[in-house]
């Protein structure tokens, strides 16, 4: 059954436009509360209890109040953490033995967007069947709990402190960050008051940028999706490394002292190498359809199996669980270390990278010796709505030719956009000119 409201990462949209309106979000809280109340999710409590966290968007106050009203109307107790990274909500939901966690965030989007996503009692994203149950409940009229059965709501004051200690616990106890200068860019988002404490308390000399949220500046020129300010600050302060998170701090980008930017594909490779250097067996890792071919080839050359999931950390997680592996990620900086956390966590991913550098005594560039990302050429071709690229004879003929010519030297990926009438043509090759040539030839068949 198709989902009406839930996408791959919860429900998201422009604030004030359906479905991100106070009335819908109230009904969403009520519907989710009904599913929890009748789904055996009380976990030992007298009634189900959920945690609501949010990032720093101005609209978070409005949507938090609406969710709180909906949940309590359904007889569900509510804890509110205030601004907290998405992975922090996942952790506290599990640590406090709660029924579910809810995050109010639109991740790396501008402030005028917002969204709602849920975590299960185990800190995982909700399974499809639970989201379908919530959508079914949304279609029913609201029937409020009796006055003596309404839920209660309260704020928890130590949420940030608990999460800070959890993040620090994932860093090896025999290592520290003394003598390391680190620039942190929190995107004026949910990590602004948390990331500096984590790295400072582990011994780093911390310089913070993107840490003055005003409700409207989240992701605006700062953070993982706009690393230019991080590159400048890392050079200006003579820092050893720069770390950028996005608005809800579930993704990471890294800059070295020379201003070179490292994406999630490279960081995944570094984490695999660190495990192998420590004598741990790494049978396989998971990337996505967009993961650079150079990383796949380098891992396979070392006997590490590599599987590509659909784009989205949700699908990376599914493949990791299916294969029983621990490490996965996307070029965008969503990285998963399932023996550290149940979900992608920018701060914890950064700590794993720093631990690898400390343990090895190497720089990132040295750890990536022998791995140079293949040049990529991406062309977006606008097409008619409903266009089926798989049945386009000209494209298929050109695709067959390109795949034969690139065999062992590159790859082609063609996929439709999920949000607009566009077909994305991406070619990777060891040579940039070769990638450009094939991408332009393929795109020309659609124009």
Curated annotation (Swiss-Prot):
Active-site residues, Swiss-Prot/TrEMBL: 107 (phosphoserine intermediate)
Protein name as catalogued: Phosphoglucosamine mutase
One Gene Ontology term, aspect cellular component: cytosol
PTM comment: Activated by phosphorylation.
Keyword rRNA processing applies: no
Entry-annotated residues carrying Phosphoserine: 107
Record-linked HAMAP family: GlmM_B
Cofactor: Mg(2+)
Pfam family, one: PGM_PMM_II
Top-level taxon of origin: Bacteria
Gene Ontology terms describing biological process: carbohydrate metabolic process; peptidoglycan biosynthetic process; UDP-N-acetylglucosamine biosynthetic process
Keywords: Isomerase, Magnesium, Metal-binding, Phosphoprotein
Sequence intervals crossing the membrane: none
E.C. numbers: 5.4.2.10
Reaction catalysis annotation: alpha-D-glucosamine 1-phosphate = D-glucosamine 6-phosphate
Species, as recorded: Ralstonia pickettii (strain 12J)
NCBIfam families in the record: glmM, PRK10887.1
SUPFAM superfamilies per the UniProt record, alphabetical: Phosphoglucomutase, C-terminal domain (SSF55957), Phosphoglucomutase, first 3 domains (SSF53738)
């Amino acid at each position: 059954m198709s989902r009406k409201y839930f996408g791959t990462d919860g429900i998201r949209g422009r604030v004030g436009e359906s479905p991100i309106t106070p009335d819908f979000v109230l009904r969403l809280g009520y519907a989710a509360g009904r599913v929890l109340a009748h789904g055996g999710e009380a976990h030992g409590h007298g009634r189900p209890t959920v945690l609501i966290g949010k990032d720093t968007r101005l609209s978070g106050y409005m949507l938090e109040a609406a969710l709180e009203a909906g949940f309590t109307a359904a007889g569900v107790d509510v804890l509110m953490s205030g601004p907290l990274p998405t992975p922090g909500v996942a952790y506290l939901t599990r640590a406090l033995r709660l029924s579910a966690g809810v995050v109010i965030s639109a991740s790396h989007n501008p402030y005028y967007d917002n969204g709602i996503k849920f975590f299960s009692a185990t800190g995982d994203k909700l399974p499809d069947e639970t989201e379908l149950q919530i959508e079914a409940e949304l279609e029913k009229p609201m029937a409020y709990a009796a006055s003596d059965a309404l839920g209660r709501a309260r704020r928890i004051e130590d949420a940030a402190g608990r999460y800070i200690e959890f993040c620090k616990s994932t860093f090896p106890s025999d290592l520290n960050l003394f003598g390391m200068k680190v620039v942190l860019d929190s995107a004026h988002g949910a990590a602004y008051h948390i990331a500096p404490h984590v790295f400072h308390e582990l011994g780093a000399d911390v310089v913070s940028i993107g840490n003055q949220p005003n409700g409207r500046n989240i992701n605006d020129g700062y953070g993982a999706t706009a690393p230019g300010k991080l590159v400048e600050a890392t050079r200006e302060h003579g820092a050893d490394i720069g770390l950028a998170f996005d608005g809800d701090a579930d993704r990471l980008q890294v800059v070295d002292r020379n201003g070179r930017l490292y994406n999630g594909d490279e960081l995944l490779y570094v984490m695999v190498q660190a495990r192998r250097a420590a004598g741990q067996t790494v049978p396989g890792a998971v990337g996505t359809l967009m993961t650079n071919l150079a990383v796949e080839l380098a891992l396979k050359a070392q006997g590490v199996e590599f599987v590509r999931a659909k784009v989205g950390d949700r699908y990376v997680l599914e493949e990791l669980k299916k294969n029983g592996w621990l490490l996965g990620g996307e070029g965008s900086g969503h990285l998963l270390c399932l023996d550290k956390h149940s979900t992608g966590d920018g701060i914890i991913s950064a700590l794993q990278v720093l631990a690898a550098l400390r343990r090895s005594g190497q720089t990132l560039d040295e750890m990536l010796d022998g791995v140079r990302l293949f040049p990529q050429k991406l062309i977006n071709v606008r097409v008619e709505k409903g266009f089926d690229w798989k049945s386009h004879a000209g494209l298929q003929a050109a695709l067959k030719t390109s795949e034969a010519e690139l065999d062992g030297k590159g790859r082609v990926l063609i996929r439709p956009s999920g949000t607009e009438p566009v077909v994305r043509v991406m070619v990777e090759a060891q040579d940039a000119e070769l990638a450009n040539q094939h991408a332009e030839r393929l795109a020309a068949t659609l124009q």
